[in-house]
Amino acid sequence: VRTIDTHCNNLCNQAIRVEAIDEPGCGGANHKYNIIGPSRQMLGVGEVPTFGLNIRFQDGPLKEAGVNGVTNEALLAVLIDRMRGFQRGPFACDENAAVLTALETAMAILHARTQRRDKAGVEGTHGKAPGDGAFVDLEADAMPNEAIRVPIKQTGIVGMGADAAEAGA
């Protein structure tokens, strides 16, 4: 079990435990995560988490394994919907707008990746397409706009930071 703490920016998030609970697969990413709320005393039961969520991501190529878990795109769709809701509500702000733009950009990049792999005839398989493996490890301390600049340029999608300024966004 590997504990993830990149969300721990306030008391609420510090009380929520995020864990990768399996070993990384052949692509380098984990497939199973737990998100667990703080524990409370339950009469006759003991300490129990106030909530828990088990997330299982797609494991294996679609053409071989079938649909057996959620996708990054499905979770992004939830976050995009939530941020759009906040932007329609009384707490709309510049930060929420920036988050929404980043999430929508991430979704567009994932869609572009799927289209590139589909065009190469390898989508849904472990086969490699031109461009796979071209983007290697990011530094853990990379700034978010630096982290997405390379894939955005590779896909031709205009995003945040200097790329957006160059495009006149």
Regions found by a protein language model. Give the residues of each.
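Signature of extracytoplasmic/envelope-associated structural regions
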Residues: 21, 113-131, 135, 161
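Polar low-complexity intrinsically disordered regions enriched in Ser/Thr and small residues
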Residues: 28-31, 40, 47-49, 127-130, ...
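A short, structured beta-strand/loop element
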Residues: 30-86
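Acidic/polar, glycine-rich intrinsically disordered N-terminal extensions of enzymes
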Residues: 46-47, 98, 168
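Short, compact, well-ordered microdomains
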Residues: 81, 86-124
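Long, low-complexity intrinsically disordered regions enriched in Ser/Thr, Asp/Glu, Pro/Gly
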Residues: 132-169
